[in-house]
């Protein structure tokens, strides 16, 4: 499958990624465990995402959530303005993949988007411990620290 666009912005790319995911789901089907997880989170909300996942994993041992799948799902929710559900998915991703710098970087980004600078800084720092070459974390961390310094100095 090839999707093309004449626009080169993050929103168009994200929309195409969401469209591609929907096409793959429609073509290949969605595993029962993943269907159950999506339904449970829609019905109960995302606040207990980790607990819901753990319970459904017992009922559906085949349920597997890849790191990039959760990350893409979280960013999709974030693009839709659903910050709290995105936050809960990124927390789940950190829980499932604690050795991944990317999971902490993504969690930091959603904390930053919700205005929780302290948690963003903490998670960017954790990401940098795991991957010292993470330029995204370095740039965001510098901005957050500078903003905090300015606001503390006023």
Annotated model-derived regions:
Residues 1-48:
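Catalytic loop of the DD-peptidase/beta-lactamase superfamily, centered on the K-T-G motif
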Residues 56, 93, 126-127:
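Canonical positions in the second alpha-helix
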């Amino acid at each position: 499958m090839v999707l093309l666009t004449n626009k080169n912005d993050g929103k168009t790319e994200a929309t195409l990624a969401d469209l591609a995911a929907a096409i793959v789901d429609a073509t290949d089907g969605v595993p029962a465990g993943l269907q159950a997880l999506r339904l449970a989170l829609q019905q109960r909300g995302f606040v207990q995402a980790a607990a819901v996942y753990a319970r459904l994993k017992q009922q559906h041992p085949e349920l597997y959530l890849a790191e990039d799948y959760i990350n893409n799902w979280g960013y999709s929710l974030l693009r839709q303005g659903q910050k709290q559900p995105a936050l809960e998915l990124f927390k789940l991703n950190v829980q499932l993949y604690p050795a991944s710098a990317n999971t902490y970087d993504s969690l930091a980004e959603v904390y930053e988007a919700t205005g929780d600078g302290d948690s963003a800084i903490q998670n960017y720092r954790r990401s940098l411990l795991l991957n010292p070459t993470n330029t995204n974390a370095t740039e965001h961390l510098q901005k957050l620290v500078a903003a905090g310094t300015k606001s503390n100095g006023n």
